[in-house]
């Protein structure tokens, strides 16, 4: 079984059930499956072969689902890319990923025209029309490669032969966010994606009664598995939100009686801070899921109290398809914890020599299971560093309690060493978030001539008039001296990536320290 065959099975069993809703449109499972087959046929008719690479530069839309599953059905490897990346970033991924075809919105045509000479391997450009007129390219060479999404979907004279994938075939190359160095392309297999989506769906009890809000970006692995693949494996309905905003999410949840919402902590913070947010806005929600970054306990508690919902924190990473841990809702959760290992996945905390550590000791979290990638594309040294004896070394520092619950302490590379003492940014950030006038907070290490490094805090205040002294006094009550920020800078906003994860590296690069 794989994602495509499971969706086919669902379409056969529940043809008239609604697979997805987008704005005022809906699509049944039978309709979705037919579009997927036609897209797979169209790709093959256009010259794409099993093993070729196709990049998706699309926002949240039914086109993303059709293209994703259609490519997999034709045996083609999908390379999802954030369409808002810079030309340099996109060019790197298209080149490094050996992309042969691109699917993107028509507004991306000028971008492709400006860089096509540096992309000789790209032979096909499929544009999704956003207006009535077909996009036109000035360059005749580009015009030769162009077609539209609608043309690819036109029924062919005869259905092509579907390419049944081998479980270990690469299905997706997912580029990491590149917090250090160049982004790395994690090769996720058909088995990786199916096993994780299936296990997540089972763990969360997803079924045809669920309406799942898809407000995270589809090109991100968190959304790909939790908001798209898992619901479609379960016969649920995917409620596609083109772009996250608190007002639109509240409206969507109410109109469609959504039952599951997944987001990163920043999204929950925006929802919580929204002036019109009230308890009955989430009255239909049976489950909220948080991932992508650690959620401050103060925010989790306040959000649950305001909206009357339960938030389950989980943990995952691109290289693990992504989910490895979830807080169980059948035997109690622990705020601040990422929960316990999900079915078929092992997690453990080890020392620098790979030896498992006892409960409560901090070490590196490593993961093993059918969800773990087979390696980084064209990066054997990085693969060897990340995968050892079947275990994925995550680079995250964690601890485990006696009940088997795991707690992320911080990224290894984000740890701050002050006068020889380890300071974990998350611990300091939890204290900052507990201040009533702090809306967002993040800390980094900055050079210090006396202690080697010092803690520097960045805060987005809830109101004007908050002073550095206010924050410092709060920290003095809750933190040892060496853990306290040496300085606080107030910002209007903290730099974030496409999924809302705060970017410490941007603070180091562009903000005064």
UniProtKB/Swiss-Prot annotation:
It comes from the Bacteria. It catalyses: a long-chain fatty acid + ATP + CoA = a long-chain fatty acyl-CoA + AMP + diphosphate. Pfam families: AMP-binding, AMP-binding_C. SUPFAM superfamilies: Acetyl-CoA synthetase-like. GO terms for biological process: fatty acid beta-oxidation. Keywords: ATP-binding, Fatty acid metabolism, Ligase, Lipid degradation, Lipid metabolism, Nucleotide-binding. The keyword Iron does not apply. Gene3D superfamilies: 3.30.300.30, N-terminal domain of ligase-like. GO terms for molecular function: ATP binding; long-chain fatty acid-CoA ligase activity. The keyword ATP-binding applies. PROSITE patterns: AMP_BINDING (PS00455). Its EC number is 6.2.1.3. InterPro entries: AMP-bd_C, AMP-bd_C_sf, AMP-binding, AMP-binding_CS, AMP-dep_synth/lig_dom, ANL_N_sf, ATP-dep_AMP-bd_enzyme. Belongs to the ATP-dependent AMP-binding enzyme family. NCBIfam families: PRK06187.1. This is Long-chain-fatty-acid--CoA ligase. It comes from Bacillus subtilis (strain 168).
């Amino acid at each position: 079984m794989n994602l495509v065959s499971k969706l086919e099975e669902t379409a056969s069993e529940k043809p008239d059930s609604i697979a997805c809703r987008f704005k005022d449109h809906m699509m049944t499972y039978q309709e979705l499956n037919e579009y997927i087959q036609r897209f797979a046929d169209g790709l093959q008719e256009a010259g794409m072969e099993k093993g070729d690479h196709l990049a998706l530069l699309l926002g949240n839309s039914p086109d993303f689902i059709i293209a994703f599953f259609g490519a997999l059905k034709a045996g083609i490897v999908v390379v999802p890319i954030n369409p808002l990346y810079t030309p340099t970033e996109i060019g790197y991924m298209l080149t490094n990923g050996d992309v042969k075809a691109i699917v993107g919105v028509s507004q991306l045509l000028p971008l492709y025209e400006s860089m096509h000479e540096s992309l000789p391997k790209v032979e096909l450009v499929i544009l999704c029309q956003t207006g009535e007129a077909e996009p036109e390219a000035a360059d005749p060479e580009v015009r030769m490669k162009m077609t539209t999404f609608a043309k690819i979907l036109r029924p062919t004279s005869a259905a092509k032969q579907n390419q049944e994938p081998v479980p270990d075939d690469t299905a997706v190359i997912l580029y990491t966010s590149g917090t250090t160095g160049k982004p790395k392309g994690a090769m996720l297999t058909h088995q990786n994606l199916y096993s994780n989506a299936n296990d997540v769906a089972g763990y969360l009890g997803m079924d045809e009664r669920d309406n799942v809000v898809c407000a995270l970006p589809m090109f991100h692995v968190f959304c790909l598995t939790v908001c798209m693949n898992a619901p479609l494996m379960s016969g649920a309905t995917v409620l596609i939100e083109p772009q996250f905003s608190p007002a639109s999410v509240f409206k969507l949840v109410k109109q469609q009686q959504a039952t599951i919402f997944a987001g990163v902590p920043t999204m929950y913070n925006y929802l919580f801070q929204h002036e019109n947010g009230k308890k009955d806005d989430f009255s239909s929600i049976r489950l909220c899921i948080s991932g992508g970054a650690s959620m401050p306990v103060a925010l989790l508690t306040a959000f649950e109290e305001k909206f009357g919902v339960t938030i389950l924190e989980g943990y995952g990473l691109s290289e693990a398809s992504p989910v490895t841990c979830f807080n169980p809702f059948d035997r109690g959760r622990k705020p601040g914890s990422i929960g316990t290992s999900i079915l078929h996945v092992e997690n453990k905390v080890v020392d620098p020599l790979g030896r498992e550590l006892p409960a409560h000791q901090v070490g590196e979290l490593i993961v093993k299971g059918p969800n773990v990638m087979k390696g980084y594309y064209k990066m054997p040294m990085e693969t060897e560093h990340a995968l050892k004896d079947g275990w994925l070394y995550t680079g995250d520092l964690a601890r485990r309690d006696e009940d088997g619950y795991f707690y992320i302490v911080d990224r290894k590379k984000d740890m701050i060493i002050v006068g020889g003492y380890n300071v974990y940014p998350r611990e300091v950030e939890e204290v900052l978030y507990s201040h009533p006038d702090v809306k967002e907070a993040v800390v980094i290490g900055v050079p210090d001539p006396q202690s080697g490094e010092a803690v520097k805090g960045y805060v987005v205040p809830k109101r004007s008039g908050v002073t550095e002294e206010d924050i410092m006094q709060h920290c003095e009550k809750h933190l040892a001296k060496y853990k306290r920020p040496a300085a606080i800078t107030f910002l209007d906003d903290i730099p974030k990536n496409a999924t809302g994860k705060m970017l410490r590296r941007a603070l180091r690069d562009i903000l005064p320290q």
